[in-house]
Design a protein with these regions (language model features):
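Extended, Lys/Arg-enriched charged tracts that mediate electrostatic binding to polyanionic substrates
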Residues: 136
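Charged, low-complexity intrinsically disordered terminal segments
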Residues: 1-133, 143-154, 160, 164-467
């Protein structure tokens, strides 16, 4: 009984700390409103940055390895989750190879996910103990400070030599990278290249953002101990990384060694980085507001892709305003049965009619694997791609990054990529009926999933702002 009492007290302390700290959702400040009104995405000048969207998981892995292999001075990698599965080991091997060449590596990982995937892991110790590598964790998991627990870093990007980068929604493991057996998530990234960056270019915006979050007090070092390299398990892990990476490199050598991106990228007029605050508390919804204003000013079309929809009244109101101004306003998300997130699935099932009432057209993806893409298509010249989900967690709790790209070529590429998924979706109508122009076979909603949804809705629905 004593142990049970202690457990209940600790659980109550954790729950109370989390709920009190994150219950209040800040409003948009006048400063943000003013900055958004004068948004730099409206400024067009001669831009030297070129870009291309990365749609497929195997290509996403190869392009990351390519950036790392050809880096000469510095590599920056920031990711929400990093696992030591097949694709994760290939990235670790590529980073270790770069460090051996004298390239300075800085790796930043979310402190909750790293506690699960990296602690006690010799593959990560093999990298952290290298003299040319620094690894930091954002907001390390600390049960004694539950009021900081939900502030997570959701960013995903890789920068090479301050000239080229990949940014998007993919984490660093098999679900998102490569083509390995097992579960998959579909997502997208943007590759941006600029051989001679100007001060206002997005690569410099991203580098400055990284320096700010890297140097803030909530980012602390991960096992910065060079003696770890002497452990037998670490030595064996490093050898395995080197062998697996070398095999992958030899199989893809021609493409990895190609350093001219001109023929595979498109010109852009402007690329702008949009970001949330980086502290660990409840955040001002900067990204939500700025994206909302962008969409309100569309001339005739807004198309959103998101894995989850968990909104409050402020967010619903934003969509109502967009629907009043834009004739073609739609969103595609996972169906209840196809959603890999039980919280997102349960909330969508409960609030689907409320979403429809805003005036937005909803398409439900039925592709079998959970769709994880986070993108917005605006008219025929604006594309928005990054890590931001259409939910309260992305709006108020997590660090998030989205790229606003002004380019008709990128817009066309994004439209084609979106359409590939929409052809495996159905439009939900009021009353629960469907418009099914593509004759899609829906995923079965199993009894087991129905029970999960019921439990989440009735036991955890009050905490929907945390999921």
């Amino acid at each position: 009984l004593v142990i049970l009492a202690i457990f209940l007290c600790v659980a109550f302390y954790e729950l109370l700390g989390i709920c009190v700290a994150y219950k209040k959702q800040p409003e948009v400040s006048n400063t943000t409103k003013k900055e958004t009104k004068n948004g730099s995405w409206n400024e067009c000048s001669e831009n030297t940055e070129r870009a291309v969207i990365i749609e497929k998981n195997p290509e996403a892995l190869l392009q990351r390895v390519r950036l790392i292999k050809n880096a000469k001075k510095e590599i920056i990698l920031s990711t929400f989750a990093f696992q030591s599965d097949e694709s994760g080991k290939l990235i670790l091997g590529a980073l270790h190879d770069a460090a051996d060449r004298g390239v300075h590596i800085r790796l930043l990982v979310d402190g909750m996910e790293s506690w699960i995937d990296m602690e006690g892991n010799p593959y990560f110790y093999g990298l952290s103990s290298h003299e040319n590598v620094e690894i930091k964790l954002y907001n390390k998991a600390n049960p004694l400070k539950p009021w900081k627990m939900m502030g997570r870093m959701h960013d995903k990007y890789l920068i090479a030599d301050g000239k080229r980068y990949i940014l998007g929604g993919r984490n660093t493991y098999n679900y998102f990278l490569g083509d390995f057996p097992g579960h998959k998530n579909y997502d997208r990234d943007v590759l941006v290249v600029c051989d001679e960056p100007e001060k206002e270019n997005s690569v410099n915006q991203l580098s400055e953002y990284f320096e700010t979050i890297w140097n803030q007090e909530d980012s602390g070092y991960f096992h910065n101990n060079k003696k770890l390299a002497n452990r037998k398990s670490v030595k064996n892990a490093v050898l395995e990384l080197q062998n697996s990476y070398q095999k992958y490199f030899e199989e893809n050598k021609e493409r990895i060694c190609e350093t001219d991106y001109t023929d595979e990228t498109f010109e852009t007029e402007k690329i702008t980085l949009v970001s949330n605050p980086i502290h660990t508390g409840s955040k001002e919804p900067v990204v939500w507001y700025q994206l909302g204003e962008l969409m309100k000013n569309a001339k005739n079309r807004v198309k959103i892709h998101t894995p989850y929809i968990i909104c409050n009244d402020m967010m619903y109101n934003t969509w109502e305003e967009i629907a009043e101004n834009v004739s073609d306003f739609s969103i595609m998300t996972n169906s209840v049965a196809n959603n890999g997130n039980p919280f997102g699935s349960a909330d969508y099932a409960k609030n689907r009619n409320r979403i429809l009432s805003t005036g937005i057209n909803i398409w439900e993806y039925e592709g079998g694997y959970s769709y994880h893409g986070k993108s917005i298509l605006i008219d025929d010249d604006l594309s928005v791609i990054g890590s931001f989900n259409m939910d309260m967690r992305s709006a108020y709790l997590d660090t998030e990054l989205m790229l606003v790209i002004r380019s008709k070529d990128i817009n066309k590429q994004l439209e084609e990529g979106m359409m590939e998924y929409e052809k495996v979706s159905r439009q939900i109508l009021e009353g629960g009926t469907y418009n099914d122009p593509y004759h899609v076979e829906p995923i079965e909603l199993t009894k087991k999933r129905q029970r999960k949804i019921f439990l989440v809705q009735h036991l955890l629905g009050w905490a929907r702002y945390l999921f």
